[in-house]
Amino acid sequence: IIILDDLGYRPSDVAAFSLPKEITFSILPQTPLASKIALRAEQEGRAVMLHMPMQAQSGKDMGPLGLTTDMFAGAITYNLRKAMKSVPNAVGVNNHMGSAFTGQQKGMEALLKEVKRQGLFFVDSRTTVLTKGEEIAQRLGVPSASRQVFLDHKLEPAFLLKQFNHMKRIAKKNGHVVVIGHPHPETVDFLKTHLPSLEKEGLTLTSVADYFSHAPKVAKQFGKERNQTASLNNADVKDSKVSMTEENALHSSGLMHSSAEKGVAERLGTAPNE
């Protein structure tokens, strides 16, 4: 599974639509292009997520509707509901920044209870090793996963290739990988060039809608389409290819599933200043 974060501010973000529809867009709430991107994604059958702003340890500005560590549960619920109104077709949530917020229990419990009420899934972007996101999500019964690789916190071609290869190694070792990237022109161009190579290595890009098919809102929004292609998917089960889907990552930019093995998601690193 590959998730692209931070969509909604820049006109250049629409270039991400040139990528396969299995790539998930995570859209920032109340941004100038949020509704436009969400609507187009829905028309194309592409799953979208809400990229929910949360407080960082650095104190960096979160943007509209950010969640802070001093908020009461009611305020957290209110902000999430308001954020969802700007991306109404979102089927899941991941954190934008959040190295402070995701590390504290009460706020995350309030957030994830509302995520569950709305039938969404949660992907922990893991901007801190101290995050309690997936731990609490699992306890509350929220479908969840965790990011394993950040693709592009440096935009040099050599670094992008290094992370892309790292992604493939994890997928082959564990049977899946969850990757997060961003709609930078450099990232979009890199993915357009390198995604075709996955099939040659027995890797297949898979949408979060397929990985989280058990999440209520995913089932409601994508169930009909999935049923129409069920016979094809059943045939694919016999294939020995590794499927790039989103499990523990989010349990980008992505998860890869192997017909031969399913491992526990390997969690690596954090994004600087988030």
Please provide the spans of the model-predicted regions.
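A cross-domain feature marking catalytic cores of carbohydrate-active enzymes
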Residues: 4-6, 27-29, 50-54, 95-97, ...
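Catalytic domains of cell-wall/extracellular-matrix polysaccharide-remodeling enzymes
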Residues: 74-165, 172, 176, 182-203
